[in-house]
């Protein structure tokens, strides 16, 4: 039967499980055979143990990704989730390869580190897509809130004005890391080829030291903007339980980075001095980092499985082909649009021109909600007409809404706005745009 038939959801999961079992039957004996042929030392033992953790990590992550593809009912939310879930297998396999072949570690590790910027970006997309569906005009919601001061260590800086300014700067803070990280990665590769990189060696003569500082500042600022964004909109984000999701992303990104720095400090201090089968002590530091990541990714896979579960997206009547779901996972048109829009907004700021508003009335509806723009089409009323899923509690948010099938926000039941509710005050303050307030259906 063709892939577009509705029964593909029945056979795709058993097929993936079967392929994985076949891979184990073929791969494990080969690894054992190579292990017996090689001289078994610390390096080989570390590689073999790390491989065991990789074999346990991959099925957990791929199963979560597969379940989201099978129940791909809310593209705006599930597309960034799938991209985030790919982080664990990419980190795991990448680190295992780098551990086995130290000479190419610099190349595979830089690809891994580049993906972490992509993950932070997609987590921001996930939060924004949920919020812009729930609160079509997020800027008005922010303007109605009390002024948020900066968090430590920037508490002495002037606060960002609530509304478009705060949104713009939080998005810019996250997006800058997705640009800085690939640029520093390319510089690192060039420095490695010219022999001036010196990975793991803190020295003013090595490019690695300066690139670590640049990446660290960029990463910390991106995470700071995420924390500030969550702090301001904590109440609106509560229905999707963002704390566990945020910790999953933050722990993987921060722990992997700082443990690499900590290991490099131990090497510089002479605590790690034995080279075993490695050529130099810096290679030992890189190998130790890769080994630890392989172990940590197993724990991260378990955490991701529960934090980014597919269950809230299960619907009784699901449509769509497996081919469409698979292609949607690789679609990066939203990233190109966001970066392009951000460059234009920065250019307008530099030239002293007004920035484009994030919330226009005539934005075209499509599958995703752009990171730097949103729609005024209100999916809440559409969500209220969808039968609740027995497995989920925020079903309906993130549905692909079209003007032909979605009523406008002016049809929102008046019961949603009580006389003493914040929404009623917001509507009173903005009588010209009553459909752009945040509807707290979860309260």
From Swiss-Prot:
Biased composition (Low complexity): 399-411
Entry superkingdom: Eukaryota
Annotated segments matching region Disordered: 369-422
Biased composition (Polar residues): 369-378
Recorded coiled-coil stretches: none
Role, per record: May play a role in cell growth.
Protein known as: Transmembrane protein 184C
Lineage: Eukaryota, Metazoa, Chordata, Craniata, Vertebrata
């Amino acid at each position: 039967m063709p892939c577009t038939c509705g029964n593909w959801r029945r056979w795709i999961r058993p097929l993936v499980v079967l392929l994985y079992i076949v891979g184990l039957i073929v791969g494990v004996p080969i690894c054992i055979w190579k292990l017996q042929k090689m001289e078994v030392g610390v390096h080989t033992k570390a590689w073999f143990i790390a491989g065991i953790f990789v074999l346990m990590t991959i099925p957990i992550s791929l199963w979560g990704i597969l379940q989201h593809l099978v129940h791909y009912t809310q593209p705006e939310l599930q597309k960034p989730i799938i991209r985030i879930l790919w982080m664990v297998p990419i980190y795991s396999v990448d680190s295992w390869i780098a551990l086995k072949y130290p000479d190419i570690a610099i190349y595979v590790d830089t690809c891994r580190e580049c993906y972490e910027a992509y993950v932070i970006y997609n987590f921001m997309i996930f939060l924004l897509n949920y919020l812009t569906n729930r609160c079509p005009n997020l800027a008005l919601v922010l303007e109605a809130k009390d002024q948020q001061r900066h968090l430590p260590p920037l508490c002495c800086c002037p606060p960002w004005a609530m509304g478009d300014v705060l949104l713009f700067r939080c998005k810019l803070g996250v997006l800058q890391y997705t640009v800085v990280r690939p640029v520093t990665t390319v510089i690192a590769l060039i420095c490695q080829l010219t022999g001036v990189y010196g990975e793991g060696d803190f020295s003013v003569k090595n490019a690695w030291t300066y690139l670590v500082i640049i990446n660290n500042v960029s990463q910390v600022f991106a995470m700071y903007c995420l924390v500030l964004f969550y702090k301001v909109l904590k109440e609106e984000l509560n229905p999707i339980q963002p704390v566990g999701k945020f910790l999953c992303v933050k722990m993987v990104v921060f722990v992997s980075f700082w443990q690499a720095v900590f290991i490099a400090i131990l090497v510089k201090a002479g605590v790690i001095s034995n080279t075993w089968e490695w050529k130099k002590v810096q290679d030992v530091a890189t190998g130790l980092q890769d080994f630890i990541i392989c172990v940590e990714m197993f724990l991260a896979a378990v955490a991701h499985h529960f934090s980014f579960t597919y269950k809230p997206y299960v619907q009784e009547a699901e449509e769509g082909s497996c081919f469409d779901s698979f292609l949607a996972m690789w679609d990066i048109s939203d990233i190109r649009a966001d970066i392009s829009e951000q460059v234009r907004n920065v250019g307008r700021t530099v030239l002293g021109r007004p920035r484009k508003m994030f919330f226009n009335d005539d934005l075209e509806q499509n599958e995703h909600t752009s990171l730097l723009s949103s729609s005024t089409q209100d999916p809440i009323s559409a969500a209220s007409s969808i039968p609740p899923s027995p497995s989920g509690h925020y079903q309906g948010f993130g549905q692909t809404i079209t003007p032909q099938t979605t009523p406008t926000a002016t049809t929102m039941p008046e019961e949603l706005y009580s006389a003493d509710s914040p929404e009623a005050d917001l509507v009173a303050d903005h009588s010209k745009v009553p459909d752009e307030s945040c509807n707290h259906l979860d309260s």
